[in-house]
Amino acid sequence: FYISQNYSYAILRPLQNAILARGDQVAWFLEGSEVNTSYLLANEIQLNSVNAVNKYQADVVFIPGNVVPDFISGIKVGVFHGFNSGKLNRCGFEDHFNIRGCFDLYCTQGPNTTLPFIELAEQHQHFSVKQTGWPALDPLFDLSKISKNTKPTILMCSTFSRALTCAPHLFETVKRLSEKGKWKWLIQFHPKMPTEIVEQYKSLESESLSFIETDNVIPLLQQADVMVCDTSSVLMMFLMLNKPVVTFNNISPKDYMVNITDEDKLEESIEYALSYPAELKTKVEHFISDTHPYVDGKSAERVLAAADELLAGKNVAKKRKPFNLLRRFKMRKKLNYWQL
C-alpha cells in the first residue's frame, strides 16, 4: 500500500482485511510528512525506504492517491481517495479523470465514472479499467453500526480549499444553532483545514457540539441523520447511506442535494432534509445506482479479483505507460532515490 495522506488508512484497510483473509501479505509505505505513522496498527507492517519496498517485491501496489513512482515493483492499481465531486484542476478539467500515466489499472466505483474511464482507456491505451466499487465503503454497509439517535444528529464536513470551504461562512450560524440545543452537532474537517478555522470550531464544543479529529469518517457517517457540507467528496459517501445532504455553495449542485448560497437558509434547509421528502429520496436513490450500486460490502474482494486478472495476463492494456521523464525525476527527487 502506497499512501501519502492519513485518510488512506480507512480506504485501504478493508482491502487489507480481504488480502489477509485469503492468506496473502500486506505492507505499507508512507510517503511524505502529511501521513502519520501513529495511525498504523500494531500488526501492520511498514516499509521505511524505497529500498525496502523494492526488496519486498510486491506483486501489486494499491494507491488511493494520484501518483506513484515507476521505480517500485508491482502492477500499480488506482483505487481513488474519494468520489468525483466535480472539482476542476488548473486546466479546467475534472480532476477525477486526470490521467497521469502512473497506473496499470483503475478500479472504478460505478457507472458514472466507469464509462468516462473506459473512454479514456480507449484513447490512451496504456491502462485498464474494471468497475469494482470502492473498498473504503465496505464497512459503511455494516447495518449493525447504524445509529438510532434520540436527538437529530447533524454532521458537518468541509474541505480545506479557501475557494470551496463552507467552514468560515457557516461558523456564526452553526454557533447559534448549536446553542439552541435542538440538534446534536458533529464537526469533522479535512486534515489540511487551516488551524485558525479548526480552533474556531473547537471553541464551540459543548453538550450539543463535538469536534472530532479522525482518520476514519465512517462511524460519523453512520451516526448522523443529515450532513452539512460544501464540495468535499465525503458528501457522496454519506449519500450512499440514503441520507440527505445540505450543501453550501457547492460548485456543481445536483438535484439530489439541498444546496444553499445563503447561510441564513441553513436552519430551514436542515429541517427540510430531516423530513426527507419522497421526491428528494427518489433522486438520492438514482444517484446511488449511478455512482456506487454496490451495498454488499464486498468491493475489496472485487478489487482483488481485478488485480488477479491483470496478474494473470487478462484485461491488459495495449501499450506501455508513457515515459513521463519529468514526473519520474520529480518522484525520485521527492523520495531522494537515484538508484537504477
Positions of the model-derived regions?
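Active-site and donor-binding regions of nucleotide-sugar-utilizing enzymes
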Residues: 1-141
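Short acidic-hydrophobic, aromatic-tinged amphipathic segments that line or gate anion-handling sites
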Residues: 45-51, 209-214, 257-272
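Catalytic binding pocket for nucleotide-activated donors in carbohydrate/polymer assembly enzymes
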Residues: 100, 124-126, 233-295
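Short, polar loop motifs at secondary-structure junctions
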Residues: 31-36, 62-69, 191-194, 231-235, ...
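A donor-sugar binding/catalytic signature common to diverse glycosyltransferases
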Residues: 67, 72-78, 214-257
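Donor nucleotide-activated moiety binding/catalytic core segment of transferases
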Residues: 48-54, 193-240
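C-terminal amphipathic helix plus adjacent low-complexity
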Residues: 268, 274-340
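Conserved catalytic-core segment of nucleotide-activated headgroup transferases in glycan assembly
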Residues: 8-20, 129-201, 295, 299-301
